[in-house]
Swiss-Prot record:
Residues 13-145 form the B12-binding domain. Pfam families: B12-binding (PF02310), Radical_SAM (PF04055). GO terms for biological process: methylation. It is an enzyme of class 2 (transferase). It comes from the Archaea. Residues 188-402 form the Radical SAM core domain. This is Uncharacterized methyltransferase PH0819. CDD domains: Radical_SAM, radical_SAM_B12_BD.
Length: 459
């Protein structure tokens, strides 16, 4: 077996939007992959965003490290940056094996390798075991046939191996290789910042989300002990004081959410944190425990004030449940962030205006407004394709602030104008500004400025 030199890359981006928005979190997926293969191979991770690297910098690193394998991850809007890294790697060494992973390529393996012939393979879905088997095969000179979850080139065509079954006991996955990341670069408003995924899988199937297809509909959670171990490493070894839990729904298993929160308190971990919750998986017991455990903000996917649009989304919630969840959060001293999506295919102006009004009516501290975006793999993508709604397949536009679908009742300019109106009308209210000065020390103003910059200076 050959010891492989493996370079894992989160590409830099040509867009300034990442720098405008502020917080950049560690590329957790790459750190998981590294943890799976580092015992037998030489692994290096490049975070092009956090380290503010140029493509020229990437080229120099590749030349110096001389990897056998280059693994790249990217969001949909950063795919062209990933392609650039792949081309750089192949130009330096045509024999290097280039592989990509992530939600976008999971659902577009043939298209990805057609758009960028420098990519040799795509890891689909949950990637740890597939990547480990790929590295093992390459190190031993074996063929790739039979590696579940892998798509690769064979005789000029793309061969898609069958999907890989999901990892049932996620505690078997090693703790991410945080030591290979530039942990000192991750800050949230100047505070050392980290991200943790305590569970995988989502039993829901919202029209705009591919999570249940990427990580399965069956929820799989880490043990409380494993979560505390990972938090302790981040806090004591890297000085992390602010955590974002990346679970789709941290509160899906209420008892476990309570247990994790109380253990954080019992262990004396001096961290504050945020987490996402559905409005119908949140109650007073959960809110109380989360607050006691150091949580300061809960992210709610409220999406719309229109029951008709909520039904189209497949959200499975009501506006009243959103009102109740926000009230519960506020009762226990938690800040609430509401996420809202406008611009679904046949959404009316009255429905969009009602959603903006609803956001202001709710007692939420922060609001995030986006335009409905049909990402590959989602039901919204399938709907847009079936109804010929796509305006572009320029992935750079898939930012959630650029309109990429034809809408029945709006032009692209009109829905963009409504997005700007949503941010301005929510944040530039006397009630919000006064509350911000006395309770949030200007944090809401900072968030509003970031949101508005995202909208006005689109990627």
């Amino acid at each position: 077996m050959k010891v492989m030199k493996i370079l894992l890359v989160l590409p830099p981006t040509e867009s300034a939007i990442k720098r405008v928005v502020g917080t950049t979190g560690p590329p957790l997926g790459l750190a998981y992959l590294a943890s799976m293969v580092r015992e037998e191979h030489d692994v290096k991770i490049i975070d092009g965003l956090a380290e503010d690297l140029t493509f020229s910098d990437i080229a120099k690193i590749i030349k110096k490290f001389d990897p056998d394998i280059v693994g790249i991850t990217a969001t949909t809007s950063a795919m062209y940056d990933a392609y650039t890294v792949a081309k750089i790697a192949k130009n330096i060494n045509e024999n290097v094996f280039v592989v990509m992973g992530g939600p976008h390529v999971t659902f577009t393996p043939e298209l990805t390798m057609r758009e960028c012939p420098c990519i040799d393979a795509v890891v689909r879905g949950e990637g740890e075991l597939t990547f480990k088997e790929l590295v093992d095969a390459l190190s031993k000179g074996r063929e790739l046939k039979g590696i579940l979850g892998l798509s690769y080139k064979e005789n000029g065509k793309v061969r898609n191996e069958p999907p890989r079954p999901l990892i049932q006991n996620v505690d078997e996955i090693p703790i991410p290789s945080y030591d290979l990341l530039p942990m000192d670069k991750y800050k949230a408003d100047g505070v050392p910042f980290g991200v943790v995924m305590t569970s995988r899988g989502c039993p829901f199937n919202c029209v705009f989300c591919s999570s249940s297809l990427q990580f399965g509909k069956r929820w799989r959670g880490h043990s409380v002990e494993r979560v505390i171990e990972e938090l302790s490493i981040l806090h004591y070894e890297y000085g992390i004081k602010e955590i974002e839990f990346l679970d789709d729904t941290f509160t899906l298993n209420k008892k476990r959410a309570i247990d994790i929160s109380l253990r954080i308190k019992q262990e004396g971990l001096d961290i504050s944190w945020t987490a996402s919750s559905r409005v119908n998986t949140f109650n007073e017991k959960v809110a109380k425990a989360m607050k006691e455990g150091g949580c300061h903000t809960v992210y709610f996917g409220i999406e719309s004030a229109s029951p008709r649009i909520l039904e189209f989304i497949g959200k499975g919630i009501t506006p009243q449940q959103s009102i109740d969840a926000v009230k519960t959060a506020k009762k226990f001293g938690l800040h609430a962030l509401g996420s809202f999506i406008i611009g679904f295919p046949d959404e009316t102006r009255e429905e969009v205006e009602a959603t903006i009004k609803f956001a202001k009516k709710l007692d939420i501290d922060y609001a995030q407004f986006t335009i409905a975006t049909p990402y590959p793999g989602t039901r919204l993508w399938e709907y847009a394709i079936a109804n010929n709604l796509l305006l572009t397949m320029n992935w750079r536009k898939y930012t959630t602030i650029d309109p990429v679908m034809k809408l029945k009742h709006f032009t692209s300019e009109q829905i963009s104008k409504l997005l700007r109106k949503a941010y301005i009308s929510f944040y530039l209210r006397p009630k919000v500004l006064i509350k911000d000065i006395f309770e949030h020390h200007g944090f809401i103003i900072k968030r509003a400025i970031r949101g508005l910059l995202r909208v006005y200076y689109q990627a």
